[in-house]
Amino acid sequence: MTSYTFTRELRLLTPAQFKSVFSNPIKASSAEITLLAIPNSEQHPRLGLTVAKRYVKRANQRNRIKRIIRDSFRLNQHDIPHLDIVVLVRNGVMEMENAEINKLIEKLWRKLSRRYNG
């Protein structure tokens, strides 16, 4: 049976793991969200999130955005290649509804998969 959990092994945890993604990444981006990724040696993708206070002032809004992205990753993790992915959130995402953010991030997962495989 397929597991849809978001365990510790599916997260980027250390600064070194985050830093490695920024060196020569595969990119998929929109005006509000950018995904950076590099292939990893694990048998699953891993996710790291950065939502800057500069773009999203309130903590509850930052948490809402991170929760939506984490949930989308959790549900789509079996369709995403074995990559270390960092999600960067930019200005404009705060005005988006939850459904819009979810639709956008799912589009970016597919775009990232195509760029990695193609």
UniProtKB/Swiss-Prot annotation:
Entry annotated with the keyword Ribonucleoprotein: no
Superkingdom, natural source: Bacteria
InterPro entries documented for this protein: Ribosomal_Su5_D2-typ_SF, Ribsml_uS5_D2-typ_fold_subgr, RNase_P, RNase_P_CS
Reactions mediated catalytically: Endonucleolytic cleavage of RNA, removing 5'-extranucleotides from tRNA precursor
Gene Ontology BP annotations: tRNA 5'-leader removal
The EC number(s) this enzyme carries: 3.1.26.5
Entry keyword Membrane: no
Pfam families listed in its UniProt record: Ribonuclease_P (PF00825)
A GO CC annotation given for this chain: ribonuclease P complex
Single GO MF annotation: 3'-tRNA processing endoribonuclease activity
Protein keywords: Endonuclease, Hydrolase, Nuclease, RNA-binding, tRNA processing
Function: RNaseP catalyzes the removal of the 5'-leader sequence from pre-tRNA to produce the mature 5'-terminus. It can also cleave other RNA substrates such as 4.5S RNA. The protein component plays an auxiliary but essential role in vivo by binding to the 5'-leader sequence and broadening the substrate specificity of the ribozyme.
Binding partners and assembly: Consists of a catalytic RNA component (M1 or rnpB) and a protein subunit.
Family according to the record: Belongs to the RnpA family.
Protein name per the record: Ribonuclease P protein component
